[in-house]
Every structure is written in structure tokens, then in C-alpha cells.
Regions:
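Divalent cation-coordinating acidic motifs and surrounding scaffolds
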Residues: 1-357
Length: 357
């Protein structure tokens, strides 16, 4: 569990009390909706685009994020800012049993100066001393004049229990949804990532996982078809969960290309556990507007009138929209963490194999 002692040092009694109360509520929700971590039997894997995750969050938000992250064994995080202050504060709350591996920040306007990271619990997950960025061959351009990904996919080797795997996280280019060339680039980024990793999986005879923010609007698009190709697949238990805050888009996904013996199954076919965790059931709820109103910047209360072009005070409905779509998404995120539970103890299968030799 994360460190809670820093809450005692908060001088504002109202704030410290609220954090403690909301953490209790959040913990109850997590207990109900996320399986408990095990010592050796399972791996709780997640991906979370934490919106512009830098040094821009209130202390209470970091406590809430740490509480959620702590319930997983390995989590891929996208949209980390160039400055690592936010990530380092998160790690200090998670404690010494946690570690992270992070990319360099991207250059150019398309990448937004972002980083990606894997955050993992060292009690369960071991780094196998390999980390790399995926660089395409010179002839493999995505669209004319675009020779590489906007944000380079990041691949790392890990082991959890019996399960050795390489895992790559992505934040696929989005742009404007109505722009045909941008849609083509988004599709080709997914295709090229899948092609690259599927070839590696075949050549190395090793399991690969591809996860992150693919900016896939729904499961019936060419984007999803591209992701589920070249022997990559997504369990239905994952696909059925939209992952944006409005629960209308399937932006985030977790795909697998597995190289295990037939008896060694990662998934529970009868009762596969997966989901998208909606933290707004416990924190930054719709009815919490009045709690956080005093923390809004002055610009949150005024807007330029479309007719007069003069600044005017926002209506209460406009302020509510700001809280729901902007303020709380920059404190937590506009994405929900998408997760899946994997089976990683193959002791019985291995012993059965030895017995039959």
C-alpha cells in the first residue's frame, strides 16, 4: 500500500480529512472491483494514459493516483511530461518496493514532448535488463515524409513468476479525426507496431504484449482490425470496456502475441477478469464541484462571448462543464486505467510434463 504519513503534514485540516475520507472510499471501490494481488499466482497488468502527467497536480490527486496504481503489479503509463516531478512524487508515495523505467521525451510537435513509462512492483515483477525504442527501417515510412512514429513505442523485458515476456507501450498519433491523412497515419502506426513486434515474437519465440493508448474510437474500426492481426489478439473481457472518462471510446487496449506451451494458459476462459476502473465513483465526483471551485484559476470563470467578442462571466452550467471536462481530468485523467488479470503460475503444468517424459 502507498505511504499515507504525508497526509498528516498537511496543515489544512479540511483537506487532510477529505483526502483520508476519499481514500477510504476509493479503497473500498478498489477492493470490490479489482482482484487482490497474489504472491505468485497472478499478474495484474494495466495501462493508463494519465493526462499531461507532470508537476501540475494537487497533493490529494497524487494520493488518489498512487492508491490506484498500487493495486496493480505492472502498469504502462502514457502522457508523462518532460519534467519528471509528478512521476517521482508518485514513486515516493508508492515506496521502495516500486520502480520505473521511462523513455526520453519526444521531439517535434506531433509527439508533444511526452514520455512513456512502466511502473512496477518489484515484489512481483523483475526487469530482465532489456529496454528499447522501436525504430522503423528507412523504407517503412508510415505516410509520405513521416518515417517514424510520432511517439516512439517503448519495449521492455520483464518476468513475473513463470511468465517471461516483452511488453511494448504506445501512444498512437491522434490529430484531427476528420483529416484523412492523419487517419491514415494513425492506422499505419498501429500496423507498423504490430508488424514489428509480431516478427520479433516469431524470431525470438517469446511472448509479446502490446498495450497503451491506440486512439481507437470503437472495436469495429480498421484500427482494431490492424491491432488484432499478425497473431496479436485481445480477449473479449478487455474489448468490452471503453476507457475514456465518458465511457464512449475504446482508446486504450491490451493485445497479446503469446508463445507458451498449450497447457500453460494466461487467461481464465470461464471467468476472465478485466475492466476499466472508473475512479470518479469515489473521487472528483460530479457533485464535488463546490469542494474544488475555490481551487479553479481565475480564467475558469470567464469566457469570450461568441457574439460580442467581449469577456463575460461564465454561466453555472459552463463552470460545471469546466469542472467535469477540464479541471478533474487534469487532476486525475480523461482516461480510465484498463486492466487484466493473468495467470502466471505454471508449476502444475511443468510437473505434469516432467511426469510424462
Amino acid at each position: 500500500m502507498p505511504y499515507y504519513k504525508p497526509i498528516k503534514r498537511i496543515k489544512d485540516k479540511e483537506e487532510s480529512t477529505r483526502i483520508a475520507e476519499r481514500l477510504l472510499t476509493l479503497r473500498r471501490q478498489l477492493d470490490e472491483q479489482i482482484p487482490r494481488k497474489t504472491a505468485t499466482d497472478t499478474l495484474l497488468l494495466a495501462t493508463w494514459n494519465i493526462r499531461e502527467f507532470g508537476d501540475n497536480r494537487r497533493t490529494e490527486s497524487l494520493h488518489f493516483i498512487a492508491e490506484i496504481v498500487s493495486r496493480f503489479d505492472l502498469i504502462a503509463v502514457q502522457e508523462i511530461s518532460r519534467k519528471l516531478d509528478g512521476l517521482e512524487k508518485l514513486m515516493s508515495l508508492l515506496g521502495p518496493n516500486w520502480d520505473y523505467i521511462v523513455t526520453d521525451s519526444t521531439e517535434g510537435t506531433a509527439g508533444g514532448g511526452e514520455r512513456m513509462a512502466f511502473v512496477y512492483d518489484k515484489n512481483k515483477v523483475t526487469f530482465r535488463n532489456m529496454a528499447s525504442e522501436i525504430v522503423l527501417a528507412a523504407k517503412a515510412e508510415l505516410v509520405p515524409k513521416d518515417l517514424q512514429f510520432a511517439r516512439t513505442p517503448f519495449c521492455v523485458a520483464f518476468q513475473a513468476g513463470w511468465f517471461k515476456f516483452n511488453i511494448a507501450t504506445v501512444h498512437i498519433f491522434y490529430g484531427k479525426a476528420s483529416d484523412t491523412q492523419i487517419e491514415e497515419r494513425r492506422l499505419n502506426e498501429i500496423k507498423k507496431a504490430v508488424e514489428f513486434l509480431s516478427k520479433r515474437a516469431k524470431d525470438e519465440d517469446l511472448s509479446y504484449i502490446l498495450l497503451g493508448d491506440f486512439n481507437i474510437p470503437n472495436c469495429k474500426t480498421d484500427y482494431m482490425k490492424a491491432l488484432e492481426s499478425k497473431k496479436f489478439f485481445i480477449p473479449d473481457a478487455i474489448k468490452e470496456h471503453p476507457s475514456n472518462l465518458g465511457k464512449s471510446k475504446h482508446y486504450d487496449q491490451i493485445a497479446f502475441n503469446i508463445k507458451l506451451e498449450a497447457t500453460m494458459e494466461l487467461f481464465d476462459k470461464k471467468n476472465q477478469k478485466a475492466g476499466a476502473f472508473d475512479f470518479t465513483e469515489s473521487v472528483y465526483k460530479a457533485e464535488d464541484l463546490e469542494i474544488y471551485r475555490k481551487f479553479f484559476p481565475p480564467t475558469a470563470f470567464t469566457v469570450k462571448d461568441t457574439k460580442t467578442k467581449e469577456m463575460r462571466d461564465k454561466t453555472e452550467k459552463e463552470i460545471e462543464k469546466y469542472y467535469m471536462n477540464d479541471y478533474r481530468t487534469f487532476e486525475m485523467s480523461d482516461h480510465l486505467p484498463l486492466w487484466v488479470e493473468l495467470k502466471i503460475d505454471f508449476s502444475n503444468q511443468y510437473l505434469e510434463k516432467l511426469k510424462d517424459q
